[in-house]
Amino acid sequence: AYAEPLTVEDDEFSAAYAVMDDPTDESEHIYGTTYGARKALCEQEVTKVFGDKAINIRPGIITGTGDPTERFRHWLRRMVVGNEILVPGQDDLPVQYIDAADMCGWMVRLLEEGSASGPYNAVGAAEPYRARPLLEGLRDSTGSTSTLTWIPWDWIRKATTETPNYGPWYGSGPMPLMQVNNDRAIAAGLTFRPIAETAKDMIAKLDQVPVRDGRRGGFSAETEASLLEKWHAEQG
């Protein structure tokens, strides 16, 4: 629901709403144009009806056992397969995920308690994860023997024309979208299970949830192998 550019200093009340030139436009969602703006319009309608009793939850990247996207599941799938895994970008990249079970349980508690109101950024965890410790922790917790090879995006874009599906792992540097302030939600009781627990639950159901649009995460196996070979050859 936020307008760009979002900064890491922004909270629920300082960040600007995304807006649409024509609120009645019902054309296809366009991320960065109409998607967030429509969320903002929904919040405004809820607030009109419920006033100061309105609760508007603003999730970040949601994952969990029913997640049909590859924004988190890709890494688990690759670790189950094993072998060397290409990881794009910076190894200290901040990333935020929240387990749907944590978010939904908290939302139910807010309604039961009846004292909450206003907007809340439902993003996890208490502090943003960092890419390398997150993936290494997932690998170790799953018992995978995979190795992780970090390759800069600038090099990748020069080496291939294939457009991969890496979800929030795009870009050459940290993204404010992955560093959203969640202080208000935590103060209102939002808690987070260990990411390893989320991973364990998801791995048990990897093949039971169809991938959205049938598009697997990352590069094709052939491209990933080719890029890794080229990278190692250049690095000596």
Predicted regions, residues:
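Short, solvent-exposed loop/turn segments at secondary-structure junctions
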Residues: 1, 61-63, 92-93, 127-128
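Conserved Rossmann-fold NAD(P)-dependent oxidoreductase catalytic core, especially the SDR/UDP-sugar
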Residues: 1-40, 48, 55
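Conserved beta-loop-beta element that borders a ligand/cofactor-binding pocket
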Residues: 40-66
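A short C-terminal helix-loop "cap" of Rossmann-like NAD(P)-dependent dehydrogenase/epimerase domains
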Residues: 76-88, 144-145, 177
